[in-house]
């Protein structure tokens, strides 16, 4: 279970980096993901 969750979070973070070219937006989105 834990491994799947870690892979999912990594995939989400990678997707965020690929989709957002603005560093500030990346940071805000990652912070939101970690707060969830």
Curated annotation (Swiss-Prot):
Induction: Expressed approximately equally in exponential and stationary phases (at protein level). This is Protein YmgL. It comes from Escherichia coli (strain K12). The gene is ymgL.
């Amino acid at each position: 279970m834990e491994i799947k969750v870690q892979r999912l979070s990594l995939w989400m973070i990678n997707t965020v980096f690929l989709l957002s070219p603005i560093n500030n937006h990346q940071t805000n989105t990652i912070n939101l993901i970690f707060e969830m």
